[in-house]
């Protein structure tokens, strides 16, 4: 008999709690405070009301998961880590047949040169509502190992689903991120938000209205059909009306201004060069070092 990951984790939680009650200890630990809180109640039905903030950021930087790091990477180390972070995520979603696309600042970076901004330290993607349900049912809290060219031992990435994703309202302001893809070697992560039908706007006759819990609203025609492209030398999907979406979020100047955050965009090399250091960015278009999955995937979306 097959048992879903969510139900198995709930069972393990109960088992650990029961065993702990049988063994008296002078140093009792509150189980929920142990943040290998990888064992949580994923009963499959979801909680009855929104909980407290689920995803926690580190005390030293809000784009790091403090369970896996105690300090940020250097400016030199960050770009290659982010590059493999998005490649492994996109590779995994493609292997699963799961619909995903880049959004927000990551989409803007794609617009310029299909590379992560050299000053950036986060990545934003979106997924469809059927995809978040599938990932929660079959792949929540799963680890995915990849061989990384030039790196002994490779890296392991964690897919973690926020159980509060079942609450589809923007009122759940503490849980606007629905899932994360986390680099367990550095603590860097990808924020994953699910795009859902906007029930309130649809009641008012806007039949194609979509929304995310983070407050962003869209029309179906803004996103679908998705376009094929490349990002960090890897196949990626982008929203259909990407120019419209970027202008609405960042203004039209974001698509033309070649000076930003102490960097200048070199029209010849298509690279953001550091202005203060008066030297070209190390982010050259070089040989592609793509990751290779070593963890098998049992279930896929049809």
Language model feature labels by segment:
Residues 1-25:
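Fungal secretory targeting signals
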Residues 21-103:
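Helical scaffold of the NTase/Pol beta-like nucleotidyltransferase catalytic core
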Residues 70-81, 117-124, 235:
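The substrate-binding groove and active-site-proximal loops of carbohydrate-active enzymes
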Residues 82-86, 90, 94, 142-210, ...:
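Conserved catalytic core of two-metal-ion nucleotidyltransferases
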Residues 100-103, 124-128, 191, 237:
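Structural recognition of the beta-strand scaffold that forms the well-ordered cores
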Residues 103-111:
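Short, solvent-exposed turn/loop segments enriched in Gly/Ser/Thr/Pro and often Arg
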Residues 114-135, 233:
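Catalytic metal-binding acidic patch
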Residues 243-255:
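Short, surface-exposed, low-complexity cationic segments
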């Amino acid at each position: 008999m097959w048992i879903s990951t969510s139900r198995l984790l709930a069972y393990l939680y109960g088992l650990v709690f029961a065993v702990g009650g049988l063994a008296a200890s002078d140093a009792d630990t509150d189980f929920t405070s142990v943040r290998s809180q990888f064992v949580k109640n994923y009963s499959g039905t979801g909680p009855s009301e929104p909980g407290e903030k689920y995803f926690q950021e580190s005390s030293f930087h809000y784009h790091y998961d403090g369970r896996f790091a105690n300090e940020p990477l250097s400016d030199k180390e960050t770009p290659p880590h982010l590059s493999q972070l998005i490649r492994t995520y996109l590779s995994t979603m493609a292997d699963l047949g799961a619909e995903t696309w880049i959004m927000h600042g990551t989409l803007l970076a794609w617009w310029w040169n299909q590379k992560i901004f050299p000053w950036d330290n986060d990545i934003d993607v979106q997924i469809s509502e059927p995809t978040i349900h599938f990932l929660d049912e079959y792949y929540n809290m799963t680890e995915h190992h990849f061989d990384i060219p030039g790196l002994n031992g490779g890296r392991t990435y964690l897919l973690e689903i926020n159980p509060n994703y079942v609450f589809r309202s923007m009122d759940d302001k503490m849980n606007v991120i629905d899932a994360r893809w986390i680099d367990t070697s550095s603590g860097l992560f990808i924020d994953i938000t699910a795009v859902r039908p906007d029930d309130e706007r649809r009641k008012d006759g806007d039949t194609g209205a979509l929304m995310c819990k983070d407050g962003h609203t869209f029309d179906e025609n803004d996103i679908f059909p998705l376009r094929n492209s490349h990002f960090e030398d890897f196949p990626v999907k982008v929203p259909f009306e990407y120019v419209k979406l970027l202008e609405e979020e960042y203004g039209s100047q974001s698509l033309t201004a070649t000076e930003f955050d102490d960097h200048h965009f070199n029209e010849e090399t298509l690279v953001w060069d550091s202005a203060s250091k008066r030297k070209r960015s190390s982010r050259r278009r070089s040989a592609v070092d793509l990751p290779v999955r070593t963890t098998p995937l049992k279930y896929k979306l049809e």
